[in-house]
Amino acid sequence: MDLTQQAKDIQNITVQETNKNNSESIECSKITMDLKFNNSRKYISITVPSKTQTMSPHIKSVDDVVVLGMNLSKFNKLTQFFICVAGVFVFYLIYGYLQELIFSVEGFKSCGWYLTLVQFAFYSIFGLIELQLIQDKRRRIPGKTYMIIAFLTVGTMGLSNTSLGYLNYPTQVIFKCCKLIPVMLGGVFIQGKRYNVADVSAAICMSLGLIWFTLADSTTAPNFNLTGVVLISLALCADAVIGNVQEKAMKLHNASNSEMVLYSYSIGFVYILLGLTCTSGLGPAVTFCAKNPVRTYGYAFLFSLTGYFGISFVLALIKIFGALIAVTVTTGRKAMTIVLSFIFFAKPFTFQYVWSGLLVVLGIFLNVYSKNMDKIRLPSLYDLINKSVEARKSRTLAQTV
């Protein structure tokens, strides 16, 4: 009996070891399958549910870029670029017109921060509505990162809106056109990027054009104030940092545009509300806007709506093509805004605006050229000299004959 019992025990141990080895091999094959699957263009993120929930894997394409419910990932890169550029130009040209129209209301120039508060409130509502239309509603970017982005967004838009109380609108826009300069500095210090001679030349041209435009504005514009220059310069610095931070966060965490807009602007709304409450600037602004609801809140709604649509396309540009390309596109849009500003709103004009603006445009061209050197071949100085010498020789030969 003892021998029989020992034989049964040995047999049971062997069966258990065999089952254990089989289960380990199955687990190894699962791990191998997961690794192979992760190497493809799609990935599986498995969320461990609570006891009352059932587990379901969420499958999402890494390259999906959705703007206002439209999936841009279905198009090629060139089509994506033209769609984003068209969206930026259409919505932001209307946005710029409405912004100048609001500040043309008598007595509104001191309400720049309150306009930013209303704008952030509308952006938060629009972002929440758009997020409900997306299947994946999880927040991917950490809260601390959003607090930093919200602070920079408040600085960018709040200081920019407030500067209009001290500056001519084209001057404010020409400052924004030179955002490439702080963006390049931000790219160097935040992402460790390197820029070539063409990019540096573009920054120099923009700087000289900006100085020339500001000097012209100081002699012709009746409401020129150095306070506005300081405010818009600080707004540019914040804007330069935010583009690089947004690009890094969205690519690292694969976040959607609607998520970025919702959390950054809702947190920014709290920042501005606390600031206006502490400085006693909320009451007078509310009283003034209550007397002119259509020309303030009505314009602000349309202003915020077009701005929200525009920022969605800008974020798509940042996510697909990077911060520098997005800045180049928005800079071209701002140049068009300056032209429309002189057409629709009466203001002093001097040809120094034209020459300084052309210098800024030259900087934009150099920036675009630096990104497409392999496609755009400009003749070198040596080639130009050779061509001129050959032309002279041919003319001399013709005269001799």
UniProtKB/Swiss-Prot annotation:
Residues listed as glycosylation sites in the UniProt record: N12, N71, N254
Keywords per UniProt: Antiport, Glycoprotein, Golgi apparatus, Membrane, Transmembrane, Transmembrane helix, Transport
UniProt membrane topology term: Multi-pass membrane protein
Protein localization: Golgi apparatus membrane
One GO cellular component term noted in the UniProt record for this chain: Golgi membrane
GO biological process, one term: 5'-adenylyl sulfate transmembrane transport
UniProt-recorded Gene Ontology molecular function terms: 3'-phosphoadenosine 5'-phosphosulfate transmembrane transporter activity; antiporter activity
Expression across tissues: Preferentially and highly expressed in colon.
Name under which the protein is recorded: Adenosine 3'-phospho 5'-phosphosulfate transporter 2
Segments traversing the membrane: 78-98, 114-134, 147-167, 170-190, 196-216, 223-243, 267-287, 298-317, 324-346, 349-369
Catalyzed reactions: 3'-phosphoadenylyl sulfate(in) + adenosine 3',5'-bisphosphate(out) = 3'-phosphoadenylyl sulfate(out) + adenosine 3',5'-bisphosphate(in)
Primary role: Probably functions as a 3'-phosphoadenylyl sulfate:adenosine 3',5'-bisphosphate antiporter at the Golgi membranes. Mediates the transport from the cytosol into the lumen of the Golgi of 3'-phosphoadenylyl sulfate/adenosine 3'-phospho 5'-phosphosulfate (PAPS), a universal sulfuryl donor for sulfation events that take place in that compartment.
UniProt similarity note: Belongs to the nucleotide-sugar transporter family. SLC35B subfamily.
